[in-house]
């Protein structure tokens, strides 16, 4: 018996045994008047006691109120005594004040009870004053001793109900003590369905201890039906078996379906607790056990050697509510053999340690179906499977093991094996370890194999590791995964192999062999090995490795389509050291760029022994500094054989301003070859072209707008009325770099001022941009002041002063995508002289000359990718010579015009600085000569 609470220890064990002895020798209520006559039906209020040659009845009904010390409802004894009831046996014992030790039915002394329609046995111990003379008042529902036998029949299920309000009391639903009689002469019970309820739904939960079935010293229970047990007490055992005084005895249990619910309200509890050597338990169909406890909680606890058990499809649900360092065990056994169909274990603890399956010694656990473990606890450790000292666990079906908890200092194992033990998974397995969010000090291991232990996964394996702890560690043990191939392997966390001394002080070396050979297979983590150990990883058929830190292997295979990504550990260069490289068209992804604190310019692959012939691709990833890496001939691969080749697979874009073309060079080094960055070429990416070209957009739009008032001034010169006016027009600007479709809205007011016509106008231009690989917007808002002086010789002098603000944005598509927006101010002053000549028939000719000075203020902005872009001030000085020819009508005129323009200035510069340190600068010269032609007219309406 375990330590169930503060009251129950070795003292309770002694008291229980003493109570059993006392109960078998003294019955103060044994002889009652009801025993004097036999009848077809027996009804009595005292003990029905049968001896000698027994008795036969139809129905037996015993009702005893406030029975005395050591009473029994039915007591049978005697070597040839068979008491038979052809109908239901009903026994009810009740007390309300003083309470004693009771047996509902006691079958003793080689006697037999044959209850063909089963029993209905109830003990209602409502009294709380213990007068038994013992530390605990005992209650036994059905008690069988000294080769006694009970047959409950199979027609109707039997029910045993025991309630006790006394704090100092304990109960056994069925208690069988074989007294070492030997095979064939055991104390035994058989029948169909049996239900045992102890303190079920009883408000007074004070009972010290309850056991559903107790088998001692060579006892046997054989039920053709189901056994259903419900227990609530300070401490509980669903089924308990032991050989207390004799060696060589065997207790056996046989049922069809087993269901146990146990609630230990102030102590520990177990579902099945087998303590006798070579005991046997066989559940043919299914086992369901749920235990809630305040201290230790066990599902199936086999605490002896040579025990055999078969439990069918098994479901264990275990909860410990204590914050103390106690234990929760799903299946625990020593040097014994058990079998299961499907096995499901759900374990929870507030502070107890959890081991879902624990196998110690040379025993076996054979799970013929699927295994599902969900263990979540806050103790010192949480384990899925633990196999020790030659133990062997086999899982034939799929396995899903999840362990987790919130204790920041705990240790978690999905599978833990040591000292020549073996754990084998024949089908796909999944192992998940979880902890709280954020930083955690929890040590998490998917698989841990130590000191000559072997863990094998014949098919697929998935290991999800909550804080990227260890996926699998072989510390003197062995782990093999997917050796036959064809299954998905998905690992997160460290994979390592190292040496360790076993219990015989012999040094054992770790071995890890993993075959990643499907496109869905991957490894995300780092790998290590120590001298003498083996770490062999094979990547083929599109599988990949995201390497999370410096790694070492004995053997690495990277086949065609598979990738080793050394850039997965962001912020640092990584080293991959292998003894032997087997590769054929594999790809290594490496970081290269600016020097780090250790003097490295790149990740590095080091081959210590052998490398296979073939050409491997290297894909460079960089965040900047590639030019420095090239100048220093960064070493990417060290120690390759002469026929092991490497080549850069693609150009490199470092998320900056350039795309780099890298060429590798091999350098002989002591008979081996190092592969280094040999040469580097670069070209600007199209985002640079677009951002650089945006200045051209601003310049073109502003210059184009300088001539938009010429039409209004021409109208005034042609005699148009002054006053309020408005115009809407559109156009298209473009070149090799962009096209800008725009619309312009103008309105203004002008009036006569002496010899001058003067006015003011506001204009808004809205442009839509298309780049080779992007789009954008261009907007201008400006205010103009203008005046025209009409000479008497048909000459005119026009002056325009303009001030505005330019807005622009760009959205760059594709591989080099980026976004940016800018704004700046602009100013222009223009002077134009023209003179009109009459050609007759209302035809006129008008030569024109114009000078315009403009300025676009410098500006800067930062793109979404962090590129700092700055433009200098742009000064413009444009001269124009033109001619207009037209014909006047009574309501207006029509004309054609042509001009030649030249930019005498138009110089600026642009600089860019990317977040990765790459820089770009260019001078921009917009000086040019161009031609403008047009046709138009003016019509007066009304």
Would you name each region that the model predicts?
Residues 1-38:
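Gram-negative bacterial Sec-dependent N-terminal signal peptides
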Residues 34, 40-48, 56-71, 82-101, ...:
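Beta-strand-rich solenoid/repeat architectures in extracellular/passenger domains
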Residues 784-789, 871-942:
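Outer membrane beta-barrel transmembrane domains
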Residues 681-845:
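Outer membrane beta-barrel translocator domains of Type V secretion systems
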Residues 772, 809-813, 857-865, 906-912:
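Outer-membrane beta-barrel and related beta-rich outer-membrane complex signature
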Residues 465-468, 474-617, 621-622, 626-677:
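Extracellular beta-solenoid/beta-roll
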Residues 4, 38, 584, 589-595, ...:
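Outer-membrane translocation/initiation segment of Type V secreted surface proteins
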Residues 210, 269, 382, 412, ...:
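Transmembrane beta-barrel architecture of outer membranes
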């Amino acid at each position: 018996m375990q330590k169930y609470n503060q009251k129950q220890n070795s003292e309770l064990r002694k008291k229980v045994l003493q109570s059993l002895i006392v109960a078998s020798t003294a019955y103060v209520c044994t002889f009652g008047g009801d025993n004097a006559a036999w009848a077809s039906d027996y009804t009595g209020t005292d003990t029905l006691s049968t001896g000698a040659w027994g008795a036969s009845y139809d129905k037996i009904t015993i009702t005893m109120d406030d029975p005395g010390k050591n009473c029994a409802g039915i007591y049978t004894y005697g070597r040839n005594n068979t008491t038979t009831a052809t109908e239901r046996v009903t026994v009810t014992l009740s007390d309300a004040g003083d309470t004693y030790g009771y047996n509902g039915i006691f079958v003793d002394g080689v006697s037999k009870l044959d209850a063909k329609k089963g029993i209905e046995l109830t003990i209602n111990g409502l009294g709380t004053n213990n007068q038994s003379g013992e530390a605990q008042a005992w209650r036994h529902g059905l008690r069988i001793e000294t080769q006694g036998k009970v047959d409950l029949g199979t027609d109707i299920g039997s029910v045993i109900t025991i309630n006790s309000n006394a704090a100092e009391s304990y109960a056994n639903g069925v208690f069988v003590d074989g007294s070492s009689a030997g095979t064939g002469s055991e104390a035994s019970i058989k029948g169909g369905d049996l239900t045992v309820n102890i303190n079920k739904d009883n408000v007074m939960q004070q009972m010290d201890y309850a056991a559903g079935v107790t088998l001692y010293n060579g006892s046997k229970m054989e039920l053709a039906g189901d056994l259903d047990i419900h227990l609530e007490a300070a401490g509980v055992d669903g089924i308990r078996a032991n050989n207390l005084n004799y060696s060589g005895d065997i207790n056996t249990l046989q049922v069809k379906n087993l269901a146990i619910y146990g609630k230990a309200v102030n102590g520990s509890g177990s579902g099945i607790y087998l303590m006798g050597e070579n005991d046997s338990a066989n559940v043919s169909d299914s086992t369901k056990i749920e235990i809630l406890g305040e201290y230790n909680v066990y599902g199936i606890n086999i605490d002896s050697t040579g025990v055999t058990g078969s439990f069918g499809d098994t479901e264990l649900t275990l909860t410990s509510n204590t914050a103390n360092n106690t234990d929760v065990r799903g299946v625990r056994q020593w040097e014994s053999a058990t079998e299961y169909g499907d096995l499901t274990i759900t374990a929870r603890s507030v502070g107890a340690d959890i081991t879902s399956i624990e196998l110690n010694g040379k025993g076996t656990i054979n799970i013929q179906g699927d295994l599902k473990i969900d263990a979540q606890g806050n103790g010192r450790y949480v384990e899925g499977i633990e196999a020790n000292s030659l133990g062997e666990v086999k899982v034939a079906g799929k396995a899903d093991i999840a362990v987790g908890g919130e204790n920041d200092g705990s240790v978690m194992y999905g599978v833990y094996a040591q000292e020549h033990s073996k754990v084998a998974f024949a089908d796909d397995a999944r192992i998940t370890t979880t902890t709280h969010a954020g930083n955690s000090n929890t040590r998490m291991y998917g698989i841990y194999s130590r000191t000559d232990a072997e863990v094998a996964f014949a098919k697929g394996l998935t290991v999800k590791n909550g804080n990227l702890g260890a996926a699998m560690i072989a510390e003197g043990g062995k782990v093999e995964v997917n050796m036959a191939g064809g299954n998905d392997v998905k690992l997160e966390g460290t994979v390592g192999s190292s040496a360790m001394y076993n219990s015989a002080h012999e040094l054992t070396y770790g071995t890890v062999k993993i075959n990643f050979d499907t496109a869905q297979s991957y490894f995300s983590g780092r790998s290590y090995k120590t001298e003498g150990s083996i770490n062999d990883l094979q990547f083929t058929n599109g599988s990949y490795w995201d390497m999370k830190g410096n790694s070492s292997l004995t053997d690495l295979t990277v086949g065609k389509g598979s990738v080793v990504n050394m850039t997965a550990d962001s912020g640092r260069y990584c080293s991959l050291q292998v003894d032997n490289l087997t590769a054929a068209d594999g790809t290594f992804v490496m970081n290269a760029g600016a020097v780090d604190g250790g003097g490295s310019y790149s990740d590095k692959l080091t081959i210590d022994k052998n490398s296979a012939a073939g050409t491997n691709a290297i894909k460079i990833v960089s965040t900047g500094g590639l030019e420095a890496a090239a100048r220093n001939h960064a070493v990417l691969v060290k120690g390759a054989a002469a026929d092991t080749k490497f080549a850069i697979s693609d150009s490199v874009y470092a998320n900056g301003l350039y795309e780099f073309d890298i060429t590798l060079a091999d350098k002989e080094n002591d008979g081996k070859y190092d592969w280094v960055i040999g040469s580097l070429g670069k070209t600007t990416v199209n985002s640079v072209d677009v951002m650089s070209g945006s200045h051209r957009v601003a310049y073109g739009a502003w210059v184009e707008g300088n001539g938009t008032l010429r039409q209004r001034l021409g109208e005034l010169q042609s005699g148009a009325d002054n006053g309020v006016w408005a115009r809407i027009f559109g156009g298209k600007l473009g070149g090799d770099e962009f096209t800008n479709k725009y619309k312009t809205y103008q309105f203004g007011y002008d009036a006569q001022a002496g010899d001058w016509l003067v006015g003011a106008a506001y204009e808004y231009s809205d442009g839509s941009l298309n780049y080779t690989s992007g789009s954008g917007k261009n907007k201008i808002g400006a205010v103009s002041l203008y005046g025209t002086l009409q000479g008497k010789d048909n000459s005119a002098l026009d002056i325009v002063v303009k001030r505005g603000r330019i807005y622009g944005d760009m959205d760059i598509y594709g591989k080099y995508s980026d976004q940016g927006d800018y704004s700046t101010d602009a100013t222009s002053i223009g002077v134009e002289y023209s003179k009109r000549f009459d050609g007759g028939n209302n035809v006129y000719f008008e030569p024109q000359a114009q000078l315009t000075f403009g300025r676009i203020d410098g500006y800067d902005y930062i793109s979404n990718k962090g590129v700092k872009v700055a433009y200098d001030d742009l000064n413009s000085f444009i001269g124009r010579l033109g001619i207009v020819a037209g014909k006047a009508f009574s309501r207006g005129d029509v004309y054609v015009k042509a001009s030649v323009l030249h930019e005498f200035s138009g110089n600026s510069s642009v600089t860019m600085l990317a977040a990765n340190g790459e820089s770009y600068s260019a001078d921009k010269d917009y000086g040019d000569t161009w031609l403008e032609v047009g046709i138009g007219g003016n019509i007066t309406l009304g």
